[in-house]
Design a protein with these regions (language model features):
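Long, hydrophobic alpha-helical segments
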Residues: 83-108, 345-369
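Terminal transmembrane helical anchor/hairpin motif
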Residues: 4-5, 41-77, 196, 202-257, ...
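Secretory targeting signals
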Residues: 135-190, 194, 394-439
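Juxtamembrane inter-helical linkers in multi-pass membrane proteins
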Residues: 117, 122, 268-288, 329-333, ...
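Hydrophobic alpha-helical transmembrane segments of multi-pass membrane transport/permease proteins
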Residues: 21-65, 90-96, 199-211, 299-322, ...
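Alpha-helical transmembrane segments and their helix-start/interface "positive-inside/aromatic belt" motifs
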Residues: 9-32, 187-202, 289-307, 390, ...
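Alpha-helical transmembrane segments of multi-pass membrane transporters/translocases
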Residues: 22, 26-30, 232-288, 295-311
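Transmembrane helix boundary and interhelical loop/hinge segments in multi-pass membrane proteins
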Residues: 100-122, 363-382
C-alpha cells in the first residue's frame, strides 16, 4: 500500500510551488466573491427590503434557482438568512467547477501529455500523483472556507455570527471537494481529458437541475443530492452541520473508488474507450469547415442537448409560479401595478442565466483551435495552402453558429415546457420565449 503512494508528499510540495499563483487567485477571487458582498446586502435590507426579498424568494422560480430557506415568516428573515439563500448555492457551484477543472488538468490531461509517465519514471508510487493532486485541492478548499468565514465575520453584522460564517465557508469548501473528487473518478473512467471534463461538468449540471425540481416539489428529496448538501446547512438560521458530514463521507468513498479504478487500469487507458472511427473518411473532411465541425461535433451536440434539458427543467416551474401568485396577494398586487406578468419577469431573469451558460459553448469551440494547435495536430495543414486566417475565421463562424443555435434550443426548451405547464392560462407563446432569448 505504501509503495503505491510513495513520495506523494514530495509531489504535493512541488505542485503547491508550481501552482502558488493560481492558488492565490483562486482563493482570493472566489473568497471575495463569496463573502465580501455583505455591505451590498445591508443596503438591500434597509427599510422594508428584507420583507420584500422574503416574498420574492418564496417564488418557486427563485427557489429553483438559488434554493430554499427554512424561514416561514417574513419578520424572521434576517440579513444572514437572505445572504445564505442567495449566495451559497452559486458560490458552491463555482467551487465545484473550479476544483473539477483543476483535478482533471493535473491528472488525466497530464497523463495525455506524457508528464505522468515522466513523473512515474522516478522513485514515486504509481498513484502518488493522484494523491498529491487531491491533497492540493483539499488544502485550497480548506483555505477558501477559512477565508470566507473570517471575511464575513469581519463586517460585524449582528445576524452573521461566527458559527454561521464558518458553516457558510465550510459548505463552499466541501462543495469544491465534492467537485474535485467527482473529477478524479471521471478521469479514471474516461479515456481523454476532454471526456473527463465534459462528463464531470455534465454530472454537476445534472445535479443542479435535479435539485431545482426537488426543491420545489419535495424538499426532503434534495437531501439525497450531493449538491443539496451545500445549501441545506442553512447558515445563520438552523446552522445544520449534518449535510457536511454526508458530504465528507461521500468524498471519502468516491476518493477510494477513484484510487481503486486507477489501480486496475493501464496508463493512458480508460474504462470507457473512445468510439472507433469510420474505415474511410467522409469527403466533408477535405474542407476546413467540415474538418472543424467534425472536431467540435461531440462537444457541440453534448452542450446543445444540455441547453434543451436546462430550458425544459426551468420551464416546468411555470405552473407552480401561477399557483404561488394565486395564493399571494402582495405579489399579485405588485405584478398587477407593474403591468408585467410574473411569467414575463421570470423569463427575462432566467434568460440572462441561460445565455450566460450558452456562452460556454462558443468559448469551448474557440479554445479547441488553440488546443489542437498546441498539440501540433494542425502542423500538416500549415504546409498546404491553408492559412492560419482560414482556420481562425472558420472557428469564429462555427462558434457564432453554435451560440445562436444554443440560444434557440434553450429558449425553445424553456418555452415549450412552460406553455405545457401553464396549460390554457399562458399569457406567452413560443415566439415570446424565442424573442426573449435573442433580444
Amino acid at each position: 500500500m505504501n509503495e503505491k503512494f510513495a513520495r506523494w508528499n514530495v509531489l504535493f510540495i512541488q505542485y503547491v510551488k508550481r501552482d502558488w499563483k493560481k492558488i492565490i487567485v483562486w482563493v482570493l477571487g472566489l473568497g471575495l466573491f463569496s463573502g465580501a458582498f455583505v455591505p451590498a446586502f445591508e443596503e438591500i435590507a434597509k427599510g422594508q427590503g428584507l420583507l420584500g426579498m422574503f416574498e420574492t424568494m418564496q417564488n418557486p422560480a427563485m427557489i429553483s434557482m438559488v434554493g430554499p430557506t427554512p424561514i416561514k415568516i417574513g419578520t424572521d428573515y434576517t440579513l444572514g438568512a437572505m445572504y445564505a439563500q442567495e449566495m451559497l448555492l452559486f458560490c458552491g457551484l463555482f467551487a465545484m467547477i473550479i476544483s473539477a477543472l483543476h483535478v482533471v488538468s493535473h491528472t488525466r490531461k497530464e497523463e495525455e501529455l506524457g508528464l505522468t509517465e515522466l513523473v512515474r519514471s522516478f522513485r514515486v508510487g504509481r498513484q502518488a500523483n493522484s494523491l498529491a493532486v487531491i491533497s492540493e485541492m483539499l488544502l485550497i478548499n480548506l483555505l477558501l472556507g477559512l477565508l470566507i468565514g473570517g471575511l464575513m465575520m469581519s463586517f460585524g453584522v449582528k445576524t452573521i455570527d461566527a458559527e454561521g460564517a464558518f458553516l457558510f465557508g465550510g459548505s463552499i469548501a466541501l462543495a469544491g471537494i465534492i467537485g474535485g473528487v467527482l473529477a478524479l473518478v471521471m478521469s479514471q473512467i474516461m479515456a481523454t481529458s476532454t471526456g473527463a471534463t465534459g462528463s464531470t461538468l455534465s454530472l454537476i449540471g445534472l445535479l443542479y437541475i435535479v435539485r431545482a425540481g426537488t426543491d420545489v416539489s419535495n424538499l426532503d428529496l434534495s437531501m439525497f443530492n450531493p449538491m443539496g448538501w451545500i445549501y441545506l446547512t442553512y447558515p445563520f438560521t438552523k446552522n445544520n452541520w449534518l449535510p457536511l458530514l454526508f458530504a465528507l463521507i461521500f468524498s471519502l468513498v468516491f476518493t477510494v473508488l477513484a484510487f481503486v479504478l486507477e489501480e486496475h487500469r493501464d496508463m493512458g487507458a480508460g474504462y470507457l474507450p473512445e468510439r472507433e472511427g469510420r474505415a474511410t473518411a467522409k469527403k466533408s473532411l477535405l474542407s476546413v469547415p467540415g474538418l472543424f465541425f467534425k472536431i467540435n461535433k461531440g462537444v457541440m451536440i453534448g452542450w446543445l442537448i444540455a441547453f434543451v434539458v436546462m430550458g425544459a427543467a426551468y420551464g416546468s416551474i411555470y405552473g407552480d409560479m401561477q399557483v404561488f401568485l394565486g395564493g399571494n396577494e402582495l405579489m399579485k398586487q405588485m405584478f398587477t401595478q407593474s403591468g408585467v406578468s410574473i411569467e414575463e419577469s421570470f423569463t427575462a431573469t432566467i434568460m440572462m442565466v441561460m445565455i450566460g451558460l450558452v456562452t460556454i459553448l462558443p468559448i469551448a469551440v474557440v479554445n479547441k483551435l488553440f488546443a489542437e494547435e498546441t498539440r501540433l495536430h494542425l502542423s500538416q495543414l500549415y504546409v498546404t495552402k491553408i492559412t492560419r486566417g482560414q482556420l481562425y475565421w472558420t472557428t469564429i463562424f462555427l462558434a457564432i453558429f453554435a451560440g445562436v443555435v444554443g440560444i434557440g434550443l434553450a429558449s425553445a426548451g424553456l418555452g415549450g415546457t412552460a406553455i405545457s405547464a401553464m396549460k390554457n392560462e399562458s399569457t406567452m407563446d413560443l415566439t415570446d420565449f424565442l424573442a426573449a432569448g435573442y433580444n
